[in-house]
Regions:
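Conserved P-loop NTPase motor core of helicases/translocases
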Residues: 1-35, 78-79
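Loop/turn-to-beta-strand initiation segments
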Residues: 13-16, 40-44, 298-300
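Conserved ATPase-coupling elements of RecA-like P-loop NTPase cores
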Residues: 21-33, 49-59, 283
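C-terminal accessory regions
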Residues: 97, 207-334
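Conserved helicase motor core of P-loop NTPases
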Residues: 46-195, 200-203, 220, 332-334
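Conserved Walker B
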Residues: 14-25, 49-50, 263, 268, ...
Length: 334
């Protein structure tokens, strides 16, 4: 690991540090943050403790919210991502508490005054995938590709993984007459929507950034010819153009579909979610709540009935952590 620019020997100069999406912070990252804050500075942490817990050890944000006697804790009450009459908002809040948002699974259910939360239940995984792909193609015509996402629990090695869906959408969307690059089953072409999956400090591009391949060309590298490709990343206030070599292709992944973990912290006008029993070990209220709240305007939940019920009935959010050891010991002693 490269480490961090700031630490206890070279602290941040800011008097107030504000961190968003704190439910994603694991123990290692939190330790690095507090080590880099100068004495006397204030730390403000914002987040939703009912979303997915962080990748890695610990449940820092959830644990800190239990320390009501020593920390100042405020609860935000106004939702800005969805409208007040949104079915996305009302159903997400029910799911957050493990409450069924519908009477029973049916072929098609639309909830909310805005009719923005749609459920479609099928018994076959292929049927779910076909609806997702058809719905995606229709949605990008309305909202544009940057504002539409298919999100699923798992990356690969199962039905309806991001790998499977990305390959199918790439085959539909892109012209394969030009140069292509391939890693395993994934094929990259000019126009491919891609996500950076590792931090690359030298290129100043980071995990989770999404862009499009704009050029693939053959270049002379000494006595050998190799392929280079260019990706354009559009941020809210800037555009980054990054060139990669063929050997750096594993830093990218196709990004028409992504895992729910990867989508955390992002929002899209239209979100299409697929839940089936191949993902059964991951299915719980946190996963489904996180997925639904990625949607700003429209959410389509495609599910096997049993998988949906498993999400509502199951909660995996609680972790046994060292931060709460003192409280647990005191509770047992009393």
């Amino acid at each position: 690991q490269k480490g961090f620019e700031h630490d206890h020997e070279n602290p941040l100069t800011s008097d107030v540090i504000l961190i968003d999406e704190c439910s994603m912070i694991n123990s290692y990252v939190y330790h690095a943050i507090v080590s880099a804050i100068k004495e006397g500075a204030k730390l403000i942490m914002c987040g939703d403790n009912r979303q997915l817990p962080p990748i890695g050890y610990g449940n820092i944000f959830g644990d800190l919210l239990l320390k009501t006697d020593s920390l100042h804790i405020s609860h935000l009450t106004k939702v800005l991502r969805q409208a007040e009459k949104s079915g996305i908002l009302s159903d997400a809040n029910k799911i957050r508490e493990g409450i069924m948002p519908i009477e029973q699974p049916e072929l098609r259910i639309v909830n909310g005054e805005l009719q923005d939360m749609t459920y479609m239940f099928r018994d076959t995984r292929e049927g779910l995938r076909n609806i997702a792909i058809k719905s995606y193609l229709k949605a990008i015509e309305q909202d544009g590709m940057d504002e539409v996402a298919i999100i699923v629990p798992r990356k690969e090695n199962c039905d309806n993984s991001t790998l499977e869906i990305n390959i199918k959408l790439s085959d539909i969307l892109l012209n394969k007459n030009g140069r292509t690059m391939k890693i395993g089953k994934k094929e990259y072409l000019v126009g491919s929507k891609v996500m950076q999956v590792d931090n690359n400090y030298e290129k100043n591009v980071f995990n989770g950034e999404v862009g499009y391949i704009t050029k693939i060309e053959e270049v002379q590298n000494g006595k050998e010819k190799t392929l280079e490709f260019t990706v354009e990343f559009k941020m809210s206030d800037q555009t980054k153009v990054i060139t990669y070599t063929r050997n750096e292709l594993d830093q990218l992944d196709l990004a028409y579909a992504m895992t729910i973990h990867k989508s955390q912290g992002s929002g899209y006008k239209t979100v299409i979610i697929i839940i089936d029993m191949t993902h059964y070990t991951l299915l719980d209220t946190c996963l489904l709540y996180t997925a639904i709240t990625r949607a700003k305007k429209r959410c389509l939940l495609l599910a096997e009935p049993q998988a949906f019920l498993q999400c509502i009935r199951t909660s995996h959010n609680k972790r046994n952590t060292w931060m709460m050891l003192e409280e647990n010991v005191e509770s047992l002693a009393s």
